UniProtKB/Swiss-Prot annotation:
Belongs to the UQCRH/QCR6 family. This is Cytochrome b-c1 complex subunit 6-1, mitochondrial. Coiled coil: none annotated. Keywords: Disulfide bond, Electron transport, Membrane, Mitochondrion, Mitochondrion inner membrane, Respiratory chain, Transport. The keyword Membrane applies. It comes from Arabidopsis thaliana. The gene is QCR6-1. It comes from the Eukaryota. GO terms for cellular component: mitochondrial inner membrane.
Amino acid sequence: MADDEVVDPKKYLEESCKPKCVKPLLEYQACVKRIQGDDSGHKHCTGQYFDYWQCIDKCVAPKLFAKLK
């Protein structure tokens, strides 16, 4: 029955798109490193996190929808 399982192509496509989104990832990692010592909780890297995933999503979307048609 394991051979009949449907594999989600999104995870594979996300992995294949990660090399194209290195710049936003590095910006996110730099932000995380910068705010590690912040005990106030006011600093965050939400913008950089979303920029990274927006890059991944923009790369994945056309490939994913082509597979779903």
